């Protein structure tokens, strides 16, 4: 017997966001896939503009892709930088970066941020960022339910 599912398997959120420095709007798309054939706990990041962009996936963390517009042609390049961590590691850059390394980097960022020693490195997700993420997903659910645009 099938059980009704009350969650979304896959979702695409199409939004408009404003640049706070000049109030210009730009399109923003968030895509979530709970069911993604061939993927297992894979995170993707993609930022594509009119003349450039970047793509990254945890499925192949040793590379990232860049997009550029050159002489009217769209050019994608694959960059293999090796890994350079924000915080020193015992194994160094000649070995493959793995889950334990990622976990230690997260802990290092947390404690550095807590002690005010983060410097120019990325910090942990803030409470405000989490709240805003929940607002976006709640608006998406309401938009789906009402078949209308929801302002946040």
Predicted regions and their residues:
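A short glycine-threonine-serine/GTX helix/turn-capping micro-motif
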Residues: 2, 93-101
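Glycine- and charged-residue-rich phosphate/anionic-cofactor binding loop of Rossmann-like
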Residues: 113-132
């Amino acid at each position: 017997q099938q059980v009704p599912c009350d969650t979304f398997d896959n979702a695409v959120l199409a939004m408009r966001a404003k640049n706070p420095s000049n109030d210009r709007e730009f399109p923003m798309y968030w895509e979530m896939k709970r069911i993604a054939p061939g993927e297992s706990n894979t995170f993707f990041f993609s930022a594509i503009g009119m003349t450039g962009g970047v793509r990254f996936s945890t499925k192949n963390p040793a590379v990232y892709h860049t997009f550029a517009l050159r002489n009217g042609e769209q050019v994608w390049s694959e960059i293999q930088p090796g890994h350079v961590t924000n915080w020193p590691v015992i194994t160094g850059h000649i070995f493959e970066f793995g889950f334990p390394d990622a976990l230690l980097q997260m802990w290092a960022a947390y404690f550095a941020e807590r002690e005010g020693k983060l410097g120019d490195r990325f910090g942990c997700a803030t409470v405000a960022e989490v709240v805003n993420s929940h607002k976006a997903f709640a608006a998406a659910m309401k938009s789906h339910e009402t078949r209308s645009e929801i302002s946040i």
